[in-house]
Amino acid sequence: MNGTEGPNFYVPFSNATGVVRSPFEYPQYYLAEPWQFSMLAAYMFLLIVLGFPINFLTLYVTVQHKKLRTPLNYILLNLAVADLFMVFGGFTTTLYTSLHGYFVFGPTGCNAEGFFATLGGEIALWSLVVLAIERYVVVCKPMSNFRFGENHAIMGVAFTWVMALACAAPPLFGWSRYIPEGLQCSCGIDYYTLKPEVNNESFVIYMFVVHFTIPMIVIFFCYGQLVFTVKEARAQQQESATTQKAEKEVTRMVIIMVIAFLICWVPYASVAFYIFTHQGSNFGPIFMTIPAFFAKSASIYNPVIYIMMNKQFRNCMLTTICCGKNPLGDDEASATVSKTETSQVAPA
């Protein structure tokens, strides 16, 4: 084995020279230079400074403007709530531990940080699944004049939390475990060991199949069908130009969210899968640290995409920030096409 396993940790560094110490008790400066830990802390500080205001503003603006409280926006707000969980439950912890060079909060703090990070990531993934299904049902119309209403949105939000908890909670109750990863300053699922005492192998397989592969299959299926439907509708001119443009803009926004999710999380998932399927292989702490910390940037991109691509929300946000006046002078009529709500279109 090229790493050192302890009772509740796995350090990707051989203890042949006797330098490895528990990441819960001692600085891990034998893994990297102190300045590298400081860089991680600076990165986490940046994510907090950007992540909290933009996600909080997303929630606040929606509460202030009734016109934004559409069913589809419930799912988008769910993403903002999940991001805030990551900011407060994970980022603040990782910032503090990076400044100290080890996970100072012990195994209990590791469980909390790992739980919030996993919960936030899974809520985001399952929210994208719900959005993909919504786009498929509304645009492809397999159920005729189906309209995505408030009850559907509430059920969708509840579904994302149930599925996310089904992934994030088991390690807290003895099925798998959360341990420090990479430079030992943040925590995640144990991909490093089989750990039969906690049935770790079965949990990791369950996680990759149920909470990553299946959601990806659903998302790609929905958007694959959607592309064909949009092409047919365009060729036959079955819907009004305004309706087509509105549906196209919403669909494009959600697709960009999916692409951004893949960019942030696929490197982490790929490295985790490699580590799990190559037990005992030789890899350094940076190998997992970079994708793990890069994945944390996911807390920023969803609200940024939403603000950039939804003109109505952008106008409402500027009005809120500027105390009731929009400096751009855009009226609501110009934003009608960009409203993030589903239209009820006659079936093909």
From Swiss-Prot:
Membership in a protein family: Belongs to the G-protein coupled receptor 1 family. Opsin subfamily.
Lineage of source species: Eukaryota, Metazoa, Chordata, Craniata, Vertebrata
Species of the source: Macaca fascicularis
Site (Plays an important role in the conformation switch to the active conformation): 113
InterPro entries for the chain: GPCR_opsins, GPCR_Rhodpsn, GPCR_Rhodpsn_7TM, Opsin, Retinal_BS, Rhodopsin, Rhodopsin_N
Protein name: Rhodopsin
Phosphothreonine modified-residue sites: 336, 340, 342
Cited Gene3D superfamilies: Rhodopsin 7-helix transmembrane proteins (1.20.1070.10)
Superkingdom of the source species: Eukaryota
Post-translational modification remark: Phosphorylated on some or all of the serine and threonine residues present in the C-terminal region. Contains one covalently linked retinal chromophore. Upon light absorption, the covalently bound 11-cis-retinal is converted to all-trans-retinal. After hydrolysis of the Schiff base and release of the covalently bound all-trans-retinal, active rhodopsin is regenerated by binding of a fresh molecule of 11-cis-retinal.
